[in-house]
Amino acid sequence: MPIDSKNIHHETNKLLSAALEIESDEITEDLHIDNTPSWDSFGHLRLVVGIESKFNVQLKPTEIESILDYQSIYAIVDRFINE
């Protein structure tokens, strides 16, 4: 299924679920690095690798540092979809 604006939330949720090893029903717009125990350094690394693999890109260090919550991940995924 191609990624577009209609299924961006679905694809973002799949990335989060796999990287943070959480169930899809645990993913809400309130998801944040501070309120998700599995979002440790390894979870963050899995998330970055997942984004880079899915979109065949390399995130800049500033982008990696900016990934702190659902909205920031969604914004990055949205940007890659619309490039």
Regions found by a protein language model. Give the residues of each.
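Phosphopantetheine-dependent thiolation modules in NRPS/PKS and related acyl-activating systems
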Residues: 2-48, 53-83
